[in-house]
Every structure is written in structure tokens, then in C-alpha cells.
Amino acid sequence: MSCKVRLMEDGSLDEEPLTLKEIAYQKLCNNLDIISSHRPDGQRGLNPGIVLPNEICDGFLENYQRFNRPLDDSVIRLFEDTHRTSLKIVNLRNSTLSSIGLETLMRHKLFALSLWYCDMISVGSHHLLAHYGDSLRSLELGISSHLLQYAEPNEKEPVDFQLTCPHLRRLVLNGVVMHHRLQFAHLHDLGHLDLTSCVLANFSLEALGSLPNLHTLILFNVWPIANQLHAICCLRRLCTLDISISSSGNGHGTYDLPDQTLEMLMDNLRHLTHLDISGTNLAGNGVATKESTTTSGMQQSPKMEQHFALTDIPGLASRTQRPLQFLGLYHTAHWACKRHDIPALEVAGDANEQQILTAARYYHDRPVLLTRVLNDLYHLFRFENCKDIHTALDVVLSAMDRHLKFKHMQISGSATLFYIVKGRDRSKFGALLRNHIIRTLLNGMEMHITDDTMLRNGYLTLTQFHMPVDVLFEYERLIKILLHGVSKTEQEGFVQRIAIYLLNTLACQVDGRQKLFLGELGVVSTMFTLIKDRLTRSVFDDVMEVAWSTMWNVTDETAINCKRFLDGRGMEYFLKCLHTFPDRDELLRNMMGLLGNVAEVKWLRPKLMTQEFIEVFARLLDSLSDGIEVGGASASVVARVREREMASANHAYLRFQVSYNAAGVLAHIASDGADAWTIKTPSREHVLERMVAAIQRWNIKSERNINYRSFEPILSLVRCYETPQCQHWAVWALANLTQVYPEKYCKLVEQENGIQILNELIEHESPYCEIKRIARLVIEQCDSGSERMVVDG
């Protein structure tokens, strides 16, 4: 396991910062042009004069996978020249490496090779072991690495191969069909043999009897094993034996005489320190019986009977005075892990937090079993019973990182992450750890993008972070994942709703570059698809409302997105929504906010100059004076009155914003002058009169649901001396914002030279008195704000 998550002295959780060497690798991995360039054939090659020693080459491959994307042949080509590059230890996971790339690597006379989830390597490349295996000391062929097996999952025909790697010390095979001619006798140095999920068929473990240094034998999910036990008992030097299985549902792992079988193993393998019998019944039922004290019909000695009384696992009676260092009892029959007297220093099981975390540590490369362990962790966190949070978090992140392609692992891990993160102070997670959690979630969601459960878990966990600040480092990738959730999942489903909520949050409070990216990815057209669907069905829901809010955000000070809105028949959808859902105040507020952004773009304003649009905008000026009807269903008259008052206040708040935005749209249109007013009715003068009348009805202390990043569009209207009514709206907007939110907006007025512009307005002869009065309010408010800052300082 990685064990990177640390519990800091202040109680926070974080990861160790990158070392200087790791930072250098990160820089190199993100900028391959430092050492390479594209050749005439389009492939990347090392630059002339570049020579990379072994330490750098091994570290580069390791860190490229850590900091970048899975390795492919294009990167491996950097190591074609074995005179200028040198590889010894290669660990590949989730790589798209082909057989050609693998040969490039193996020509380096590797010391260790590990392949996991490398789907592109086929059995046709197994000859590479014969050609280049002489130097190998460690060979690990994990899940989906088909070098010695056929890719078809149900294919049980063995590949005819021999292990022509005479110096192997460690061999890991996963799911390989072992043929009876397979030889091991020549592997004199072999000490660690892992045959997880291998099919023995006619192969006998007696072939291992001639290995003088074999100390570890892993037979996880290998069955049937009962007929191989005598061969195992002959491996007297074993220190570690694993005969566990992931599930006993098919009858495997169930022994006729479990106590005697385990006792036989203990009698013969006296050097064992690590034993795993998870999933089996070898721990017995915990009850002493006459039969359980007999081995092959022979009575146990009085000494053995005395030892038996000290353990609840009869077959381990001989180890009560010499306990095992590790014992795997995960999902054993009769809940062996919950017994009291277990002769082992460390136990993997599901009885408590310590056993679960131990299981996660030992089973880190067994995705099916590890998924169950994560489910156990999930239940611990769900009921807030987990104390060793930093270890648990490290376990989950490591599991998800190692088994990216294993969907159920990602689903289980993301659910556990949600409960780890949920409800905890954001400051308790350091920046490095936060980034790791978010990156791991995005990796899983991206890999399993079509699975709604994975998306739901990921989205929910992301809502626990501070948006958009915490995700800016992965902003573009997250947007793509959210767009999929919005457009490719069930209409009105939970995944779609939470995806559009997050998308809207990310569209807010980001800079212009990110808003441009949103537009380029098709956010506007995606929102139109959602809106069109609901208009067709005459359905109003939160997705419809948030879709307009999202477009409001992405068009803010982003002219090209405003154009995308108009080009996508945005005004047509606006009118249809207005007519179909006339009483939806939130919807109307969002739509008019968006049109306010469009109206700020001078070269787009002519498209708003139609009689129909202007009449609608003028009518919406009077939104604040509309009547309101609120139905009451409360039994209490007092409750009904309060409900009416609250609804009325909310209605007035939303209608004020509609009126304000409508006036803003008209002010910008009118600022282009009388010649640009190309319609006869309503007349420009009539609309401006109505706009001023609306402004005079507004409360200068009204709160706002808006975020101005710049006052440039408003200040441009302050300079519009040809049309004082436009200035009226502009100075009122500044006065309102600086009165209600002085800390934020007084500073913005000053930064954008607003005080000088307002003073010029006051000195000018054109604006009428009310405009100048409001302008003075803004200046006075900003002056008082500056004085407060001096006093506070």
C-alpha cells in the first residue's frame, strides 16, 4: 500500500509533499520536449546528445504513470536506443502498450517486469520471455496481462510455454492455465510463487518440490486444492502459505475434515509465519469435538490437548505458544475472525476496524476481495465508527488507483470516499490530499463514464468540496464528465440533476478563459437540448431552471458564448419559456440575467431590436408591481399568513431582479442612440420613460443574487451623456451594490476608475439631478468604506 496519507500534528490529514526529485520528474513528464522531439516520421525520439542512466529511466516510467496518463508505445519509443537509455525495473499498470512496445522494453535485459491491466499485450508475445527472460529476477503478470494466457475469459486451453527465466526469484501469474508439462525444477532461485486464480488442470504442485528456496506460495482462488495438500506439506521451507478463496458459494474451500486438515498443514509446515485460509472452513466451528482432536485416526498427545484449550481454532492448537505473524480469516465459515483466542499477531477479517484495515493492506491486488473490504469500510464510515481515518483513506485511494478498470472497486471506493469526506471540515484536508481525492474520483468516473452509479457517487463526493476553487486544477476534465452526466443520463434523473447543479456552480466565479472552454465544449447547445425537451413535455423542473442559470453564467462577459446563445435560437426558447411558464419567477430571473449579458455586447444588440422583444422587455419593467396569489394549505391561520408573507417577500425579491435586468437590457440597447432604434413601436422615448419609472420604484437597499467581476459595462453607461436615462440605471446599479455589499464593490468601483467617472458625471451639465444625487451616494459610500479600512488597519 502507498501509506502516503498522514495524520498531522494539528489533526489535519494530508500527504507528504513531493521531493525535489519528484518535482523534477513531474516537470519532465509534463514537458517531454525537454529531452525529445518529433522525428520526420512523426514519432518522438530522444534529442541528440541526451543520455539517460538507469536510475532516471526507471524513475521516469514510474512517475510518468503517476503524474500523467497510462504509458503507450509513443512514450516507450524514447527507450529504443539501449546505449543511451537503460531500464532495469519496469512496472506497468493500465497501459496501452503493445507487443512492439513490450519488446522495446525487454531488450534492456530487465531485472524486474510487472504488467497489470495491459490489455493490448497478447499471448503471441510469450516468445519474448524466451528471448529476453534470462536476466529477469522478478516477473509479475497480473490481471488482463495475456502474455501467457488467451484473452477470452472462458478459454481454458493452456498456452504451451516454459519459464525460460532461470534466475527468477519472484514469479506472479494470474489466471494462467497451467499445463502438465510446465517445468519448475530449473528455477533454483525461486523463493516467491504466486499462482492466484490459476487453473491447475493436470498440473501437480509436486513440481515445486525440487525448489530449494521456495518460502512463499500463494494459491488464492486456486481449486480444487484438497488433492494437492500432500504436495504442499512437502514444501517444508514455506514461511507463507495462502490457500484462501474469495467465495465459498460454489463449494470450493469447504473441506470434509477442516480441523484435521489444518492441523496436518501445521504439523508439516513448522516454519509458517503467514497463513491465509480466508473463505474456507479450515478454522472449524470453534467447538472442540472428539474428532477434532484426532489426526488421521491417531490420538493427540496431552500436550496438544493442553494447547487446544487455549485457542478457538482447533487446527492451530500447535501455534498457541508460537503465534503466527499473520492469519487470514476474512469471510471464513462460522465467523472465525470473531473468536477470542486466535493464535496470530495480526488478523485479516471483518470483525472490527483493525481486521478490515489489515485485510485491505494484504489484499491490495485482489480486486474482488478488496471490493468487499471497501464495502466493510463503507459501513464503518456510514455509521461513523471508523477511528483510523488516515489509514482508511489511504487504503481507499490506493485501491482505486491500482484497480482503475475494475468498476465495482471504483463504485465501492467512491461511496466510501463520500462518507470519509462528508461532514468534515474542509480545512482538515490538506491541498495535496484534496487533489489526490478529486483526481482519483475523476479517473474512476472517466473510466466508467457510462455507469450511472459511479457518476452519482463521484458527483455527490465532489459536492463536499469548495467549488470551483478545489477543482480548478482539473477543471477541463471535470467539465467533460459533467456534460456527459447532463446529456447522456436519464432525463429528470438524480444523476442529471446533480450534474447540472455542479456544472452551474463551476460556470460561476471562473475567469473568461474557462468560460470560453465551456462554450467550446458545447455547454450552451447542451442546455438548449434540456430546455427543448421540457418545453416539448410542458414540464418545469429544477433542471430547466438551472439550465438557464448555467447559460447566464457562461455568457457573463464572454461575447462568443452570447453569440452561441443567439445562434442556437436562444430568443425563441426565451419566448416559449416565458409563455409556457409565466409564473416561474426564478426562471424569469435567470433568463433576463442572461439577456443582460447579451445586451452588453454592442455588436449583438441589433439582434434584440425587434418589436416583439422590446415589448417583452418593457412589460417586464413592471414586474415589481404585479399582484401575487399564494395558496395556503396550513391548518393554522397564523401559519397561512406567515407562508403568504414569506412567499410574497420571495416573489418581490425575484420580480425586482427581473425588473432590474429588463431595465439593464433596455439601457444598453438605448445607449446605441436614436438611430439604432429601428422599430416604430414601442417608441424609444416611451420605453425610456417606463424604465425611469421602474427605477424610481426600486429599493436602493435591495439584496441581489448576482456576482459582478467587472463594472466596465455599467461604467460605459455612466458615460452615455446622450441618453441620461441609461446613466440613471447605471448609477442606481452602482449605488445598490455598494450600499448592500460595500466590502466587495466599493473596492471594485475604485479599481476601475469609477470615482473619477462619477465625478465627471456630477460636473457635466446633461444628467438630471436625480442621477447626480445617486452618483454622490456611490462616492460617499466608497469614501466611508476607505475610512473604515484605514481604521481597521
Swiss-Prot record:
A single cellular component GO annotation: Cul2-RING ubiquitin ligase complex
Key words of the record: Leucine-rich repeat, Repeat, Ubl conjugation pathway
Keyword match Iron-sulfur: no
Gene3D superfamilies reported in the protein's UniProt record: Leucine-rich Repeat Variant, Ribonuclease Inhibitor
Ranges of the LRR repeats in the UniProt entry: 84-108, 187-210, 269-294
Function: Serves as substrate adapter subunit in an E3 ubiquitin ligase complex CG12084-cul-2-elongin BC. Targets substrates bearing N-terminal glycine degrons for proteasomal degradation.
Record family assignment: Belongs to the zyg-11 family.
Protein name per the record: Protein zer-1 homolog
